[in-house]
A protein has these predicted regions:
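Short catalytic/metal-binding and nucleic-acid-binding patches
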Residues: 1-190
Length: 190
């Protein structure tokens, strides 16, 4: 089971400010204007290390092939156990994303918390994707630590995360479909 929210599509205005970003599973076209939305992803601490056999991303170099020795090197250096999110924790994350988006006046198109990562599709006019991601992560961390002692005094998430600009309604539909279904149906992940 996956905790999800889906909101109907209502286009926002555009203004200057985004660059091209490419995901292995989705290629998004950038038009130089403020994006229609951000596709934001972050992972649970230790669950997706550099060298991972599922491929991994290297800053400014994109997708990288598996490197088992590198992945093992990172695993050996983890300072905390790797935790996965159970259903109540995933629901708490999705609810907090929805709460924060409403509070900030951001449009939440979709939020899904999986056992080892989180996806959110958000329109936040006037904000950088990294800032939106960081605010979502910080608030989700607070909620998890308030409700579950296991998350206190340890990192909950991997440092950083990913954000991609979504500029067209077609891209928005593809991203929402990916977040909703492609994790379970990899044939849609093309």
């Amino acid at each position: 089971p996956v905790a999800m929210f889906y909101y109907s599509y209502q286009p926002q205005g555009v203004s200057p400010g985004c660059r091209t970003r490419i995901l292995r599973h989705l290629e998004l076209q950038m038009n130089g204007d403020e994006p229609l939305a951000f596709f934001i992803t972050w992972t649970v601490y230790g669950s997706f290390l550099q060298g991972d056999n599922r491929w991994w991303r290297k800053r400014q170099q994109g997708e990288q092939p598996p490197q088992p020795k590198l992945a093992q090197w990172h695993r050996d250096r983890l300072n905390h156990l790797v935790l996965i999110l159970d259903e109540p924790q995933r629901l708490a994350v999705v609810n907090e994303i929805a709460r924060l988006c409403e509070y900030r006046g951001w449009q939440l198109w979709k939020a899904v918390a999986r056992t080892n990562h989180v996806h959110a599709v958000v329109t936040a006019t006037g904000y950088a994707g990294s800032r939106v991601r960081d605010q979502l992560k910080a608030n989700c961390t607070r909620v998890l630590r308030e409700q579950w002692a296991i998350f206190v005094d340890r990192p909950v998430w991997t440092t950083g995360g990913d954000w991609q600009c979504v500029n067209t309604e077609e891209e928005l539909d593809r991203v929402i479909l990916y977040v909703s279904e492609a994790q379970d149906r990899k044939e849609l992940d093309a």
